[in-house]
């Protein structure tokens, strides 16, 4: 399978990049794409940068230039479910924007006009990710809603509003929904797999930086194991 992998920050892509065999690089619009073999698949890896605009551009370039069969977004997130701890993993069943509000025109909270309210991850990718993580790790793994916004969620007022708007949200981050929206538009299956670097309402920039490496190691490990399983999956 031809798989595209996107991570926002250097620690989130470094481990995967170093594990690739016969890597080749291509730079487009300031983004460096690494193509090679990883766990029995052809893989193209890119560090998108942080936020929705950067990740949208990176995803568009990835799909347009490399035509992956699917896209995996990996990296860290802030946990919203109270049962989650640092290092635990959330797999997206659906991804939504938490910082979009066009409800004045009849749209759902988080819904971009002319787009679905949420973007569903491909069920085969979700199932494969869930099975993989259960086999290789004893960390808690939840499957459900991940929300995205251009906000580092450490303000209690913003956190409570997000909880009110999206009561089933398991985790929050800054790229997944824009990647998902781009994949939806360009008809490419996707899944988001995030390891918790902090827990919303408890985190600070210091705690995020402290646990980012742990989250990056965990998420990279999950992606490699998922790639091994994808050799037998047909989308």
From Swiss-Prot:
- In this protein, the active site sits at 12 (proton acceptor), 198 (proton donor)
- What is one Pfam family matched by this protein? PNP_UDP_1
Name the Gene Ontology biological process terms: L-methionine salvage from methylthioadenosine; L-methionine salvage from S-adenosylmethionine; nucleoside catabolic process
CDD domains named among the record's database cross-references: MTAN (cd09008)
Does the keyword field hold RNA-binding? no
> What SUPFAM superfamilies does UniProt report for this protein, alphabetically?
Purine and uridine phosphorylases
Q: Which Gene3D superfamilies match?
A: Nucleoside phosphorylase domain
* Amino-acid positions noted as binding substrate in the UniProt annotation, renumbered to this chain: 78, 153, 174-175
Query: The organism sits in which domain of life?
Result: Bacteria
| EC number per UniProt | 3.2.2.9
Q: What InterPro entries does this protein's entry cite?
A: MTA_SAH_Nsdase, Nucleoside_phosphorylase_d, Nucleoside_phosphorylase_sf
| Cellular component GO terms held in the UniProt record | cytosol
Name the keywords, alphabetized. Answer: Amino-acid biosynthesis, Hydrolase, Methionine biosynthesis
Q: Which reaction does it catalyse?
A: S-adenosyl-L-homocysteine + H2O = S-(5-deoxy-D-ribos-5-yl)-L-homocysteine + adenine; S-methyl-5'-thioadenosine + H2O = 5-(methylsulfanyl)-D-ribose + adenine; 5'-deoxyadenosine + H2O = 5-deoxy-D-ribose + adenine
Instruction: Give the pathway listed in the UniProt entry for this protein.
Output: Amino-acid biosynthesis; L-methionine biosynthesis via salvage pathway; S-methyl-5-thio-alpha-D-ribose 1-phosphate from S-methyl-5'-thioadenosine (hydrolase route): step 1/2
**Top EC category:** hydrolase
Question: Which GO MF terms are attached to this record?
Answer: adenosylhomocysteine nucleosidase activity; methylthioadenosine nucleosidase activity
- Write out the similarity annotation: Belongs to the PNP/UDP phosphorylase family. MtnN subfamily.
The record's PANTHER family line, in alphabetical order, gives: 5'-METHYLTHIOADENOSINE/S-ADENOSYLHOMOCYSTEINE NUCLEOSIDASE, 5'-METHYLTHIOADENOSINE_S-ADENOSYLHOMOCYSTEINE NUCLEOSIDASE
Q: What is the stated purpose of this protein?
A: Catalyzes the irreversible cleavage of the glycosidic bond in both 5'-methylthioadenosine (MTA) and S-adenosylhomocysteine (SAH/AdoHcy) to adenine and the corresponding thioribose, 5'-methylthioribose and S-ribosylhomocysteine, respectively. Also cleaves 5'-deoxyadenosine, a toxic by-product of radical S-adenosylmethionine (SAM) enzymes, into 5-deoxyribose and adenine.
Stated name of the protein: 5'-methylthioadenosine/S-adenosylhomocysteine nucleosidase
Name the lineage: Bacteria, Pseudomonadati, Pseudomonadota, Gammaproteobacteria, Alteromonadales
Q: Encoded by which gene?
A: mtnN
């Amino acid at each position: 399978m031809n798989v595209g992998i996107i991570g926002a920050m250097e620690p989130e892509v470094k481990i995967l990049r170093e594990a690739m065999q016969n890597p080749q690089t291509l730079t487009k619009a300031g983004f460096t794409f690494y193509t090679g073999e990883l766990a029995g698949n052809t893989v193209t890896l890119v560090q998108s940068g942080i936020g929705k605009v950067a990740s949208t551009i990176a995803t568009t370039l990835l799909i347009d230039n490399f035509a992956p069969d699917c896209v995996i977004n990996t990296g860290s997130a802030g946990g919203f479910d109270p049962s989650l701890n640092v290092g635990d993993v959330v797999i997206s069943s659906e991804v939504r924007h938490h910082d979009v509000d066009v409800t004045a025109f009849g749209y759902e909270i988080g819904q971009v006009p002319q787009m679905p309210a949420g973007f569903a991850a491909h069920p085969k990718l979700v199932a494969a990710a869930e099975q993989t993580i259960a086999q290789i790790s004893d960390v808690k793994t939840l499957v459900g809603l991940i929300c995205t916004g251009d906000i580092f969620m450490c303000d209690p007022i913003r956190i409570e509003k997000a909880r009110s708007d999206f009561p089933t949200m398991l985790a929050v981050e800054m790229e997944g929904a824009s990647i998902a929206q781009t994949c939806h538009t360009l008809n490419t299956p996707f899944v988001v797999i995030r390891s918790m670097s902090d827990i919303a309402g408890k985190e600070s920039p210091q705690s995020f930086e402290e646990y980012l490496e742990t989250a990056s190691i965990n998420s990279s490990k999950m992606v490699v194991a998922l790639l091994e399983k994808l050799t037998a999956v047909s989308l």
